[in-house]
Amino acid sequence: MEPHTFEQDGVTYEVRFTREAEAWIARIRRAGEATAQIVAFPHERGYDSDDVRASLIAGCEAAVPNLPWAAVTRH
């Protein structure tokens, strides 16, 4: 699946998706940073199978505010 980029509160995030045996895995990272947060969407119940991409993107965008990000530093 193609990567997705979105912005929240002035911060740009990049998401890469991979399909694994038991779930779709989303690796969400702030643009330009090496560290990623991993979110899993289990098959059969973690997303809408009629529109997988849109469902995974919506889940990632909803998860971002609740993930344990390091404080943003601006120089």
Task: Name the predicted role of every residue range.
Residues 1-21:
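Short N-terminal "domain-start" leader segments
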Residues 6, 11, 30, 45-48, ...:
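Exposed, low-complexity/repetitive linear segments and helix-based recognition motifs
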Residues 14-42:
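A short, structured beta-strand/loop element
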Residues 35-75:
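Mixed-charge, Lys/Arg-enriched low-complexity segments
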